[in-house]
Amino acid sequence: MSDRLTLLRPDDWHIHLRDGAVLPHTVGDVARTFARAIIMPNLVPPVRNVTEAGAYRERILAARPAGSRFEPLMVLYLTDRTSPEDVRAAKASGFVYAAKLYPAGATTNSDSGVTSIDNIFPAIEALAEVGMPLLVHGEVTRSEIDVFDREKRFIDEHMRRVVERFPTLKVVFEHITTSDAAQFVTEAPANVGATITAQHLLYNRNHMLVGGIRPHFYCLPILKRNTHQVALLDAATSGNPKFFLGTDSAPHARHAKEAACGCAGCYTAYAAIEMYAEAFEQRNALDKLEGFASLHGPAFYGLPANTDTITLVREEWTAPESLPFGEQTVVPLRAGEKLRWRLLEKNA
């Protein structure tokens, strides 16, 4: 087995960069590995129109490391009031690539999200007309629904209906966490795809809960049981172009995670491709990593694959205990642990 792995440079089709003083840190981490990234719009206030998307894009570009060509692909945050005109303006901008459906209350900064999917059917119809993907956080949010069942219920109550009603709409079922979602995407038409995170390939709920609660494993959708983890590994390593890389890297300051009511999100951008390599290696499927990380996403979005490459080397290194995060610190996933693959820096 080779100790070096060279891939076409990957893209991240789902990431949270946050805003303000933390941008130089989060943008620097993603730009180290990825050429492009789909930027989540759940700021406070959210990115609801092309003007706000353009302003956020400029802040991200200004935070890039010197010499970086990293390209942020902006996303519109859908609300009950998003109009077809908002969608058409976003498409015409040339820098907004998708629109995001957050069910209200589903995750961090989603309070402005959609209260009923029926409210945004005119906007979804416009998305289908202009060829812009709908990105879906697929969880129901009613309090009586068990947190481990919310993804499956969303499929049954909403996803099937949306896919059937808008047969030409490109839909990305984001950060899928269940065998139900993997099966749904596999059986759906070619215009339905899904992203999968590194943490959902490497871990299950036992890692978060057994022997004590580990807040840095807590994300939404929440880690599920091992059988779902296995199904996600099957999907990611299958070579099926419907499945592609989306880290959902979502930083929170240490005090916001290590709290009585901690925030949801795992910070993986600093070593994401290294973690994916571990997951694929566990399945003896490193030959499938380039498709998942570098080819399937661009093909789904109708974009060219990158032409430059990255190289991973099989070399143990210890992840940092913490990383700078503006004036605070963030504890990354795998903090203080050994990783088996290392990205070979260009000047190394």
Curated annotation (Swiss-Prot):
**GN (gene name):** pyrC
The reply to whether Hydrolase figures as a keyword in the UniProt entry is yes
Q: Which GO terms describe its biological process?
A: 'de novo' pyrimidine nucleobase biosynthetic process; 'de novo' UMP biosynthetic process
Task: Provide the positions where the record notes the PTM N6-carboxylysine.
Answer: K100
- Which pathway does the database say it acts in? Pyrimidine metabolism; UMP biosynthesis via de novo pathway; (S)-dihydroorotate from bicarbonate: step 3/3
Q: Which InterPro entries match?
A: Amidohydro-rel, DHOdimr, Dihydroorotase_CS, Metal_Hydrolase
What does the UniProt record say this protein does?
Answer: Catalyzes the reversible cyclization of carbamoyl aspartate to dihydroorotate.
Read off the HAMAP family from this record: PyrC_classII
Disulfide bond entries: none
Q: Which UniProt keywords apply?
A: Hydrolase, Metal-binding, Pyrimidine biosynthesis, Zinc
Listed cofactors: Zn(2+)
- Reactions mediated catalytically: (S)-dihydroorotate + H2O = N-carbamoyl-L-aspartate + H(+)
Record-stated family: Belongs to the metallo-dependent hydrolases superfamily. DHOase family. Class II DHOase subfamily.
Tell me which domain of life the UniProt entry assigns to the organism this sequence originates from.
Bacteria
Q: Name the chain's protein.
A: Dihydroorotase
